[in-house]
Amino acid sequence: MFRIYLYLILAASVSALATDMIVPALPILQNAFNTDYSTIQLTISGFLVIYACSQLLSGFIGEKLGKLRVLTASFLLFLAGSILCFMSESLMTLLAGRALQAVGAGAGPVLSKAIAKETFAPLILKRALSDISSASAVVPLIAPLAGALILGHLNWNSLFLVMALFSVVTILLSPRALVHHDAAVVPSSSGFVTPAFIQGTLLVSLILSSLFCYISLSPAIFMQQLGLSTLNYSLLFSASVLFFILGNQMAKFERMINPWVLFIVNALSVIPFILGSHSLLLCIAGSMMFNLSLGAYYPTANFIALQIKGTKTGIAASVTGFIQTVSAGTISFFAVKLTDTGMGFDRTLGVSTLLLALLSLLVVTTLKVTQWKTGKKGK
């Protein structure tokens, strides 16, 4: 059990590792290849575009060829891309390697959830999703620091050697076969979509969009407007991640994850930003409660999104993964663009995340109404 648990956690974390570890190396890569910063940003932005498409495709391919087989093949692709990046002497070779990495990374977060759904009983599944979400949150916390430490002693291409080793370890942990707890389920020929799938997908998309807005706007708020140094902001961001992880672990306890309470707390937590408060203490407290409340419901939202008809969990997870990635990227992009109107970074963050919290409350309400109607019909 521990081996499959660790395997799924590593598989879910690969995309975060691939994007966050090279962030400290971007200025170094710019100098190494003698190019402008916007071009070198393609190593991240281009990666994310291909990664989103790979997420969508991997679920469909996994249903046809087998999820475990496709996941192993994807890590072999990621390994090949990492080696190509490690050996690259031109920008085009580096970008080609990153493209291969992105294709390989797309299957990890998607198929790990699908495999967890088919392998674990519902109670264990909720705990597994909490741990997978926590591990995925830890990687963005550790990866940039690890990248900076490596760059302090070795060349930039050593980062890709670490990624290659990560993929090798994950492949070695791959189980030979999967034990399905719900093997008696008969595949549905009428499609997999259920109201719960739609509502769960909307919820994870709204939650991730809120997080992306915070990640995009909080540096300007705390460093430019409130005067924190880069180091102090890094510590604050680390604390935010830790509160998100704490929320993930709270999700294991049913009594602690009332969605109405959590999203109301989430909405209230951004009031200091809406009011343009200059109190550093209030803004920090709001940030911590913001991340805690989102983290507490994120695993449950993923669990809801996996409640489908039939056994096409790979396709369902890939559709959810694609929608949440595209939604979060698009919404956070337009939130940042709003600052060009003179609205201010703090008020932009507050208003955008408040709207997302209210939309989440609306989705939760429709979810509960659907559950009530379904239960009533079944009686």
Language-model segments: what does each one mean?
Residues 77, 81-84, 92-100, 281-289:
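Paired small-residue
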Residues 53-91:
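Conserved MFS/SLC helix-loop-helix module at the cytosolic interface between two early adjacent transmembrane helices
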Residues 34, 66, 87-93, 104, ...:
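Helix-breaking motifs and short loop linkers at transmembrane-helix boundaries and internal kinks
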Residues 306-345, 352-353:
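A late C-terminal transmembrane helix in Major Facilitator Superfamily
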Residues 3-37, 58, 214-219:
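Extracytoplasmic
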Residues 233-254:
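Transmembrane alpha-helices of Major Facilitator/SLC transporters
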Residues 122-175:
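Helix-loop-helix hairpin linking two adjacent transmembrane segments in secondary transporters
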Residues 97-136:
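Cytoplasmic helix-loop-helix junction between adjacent transmembrane helices
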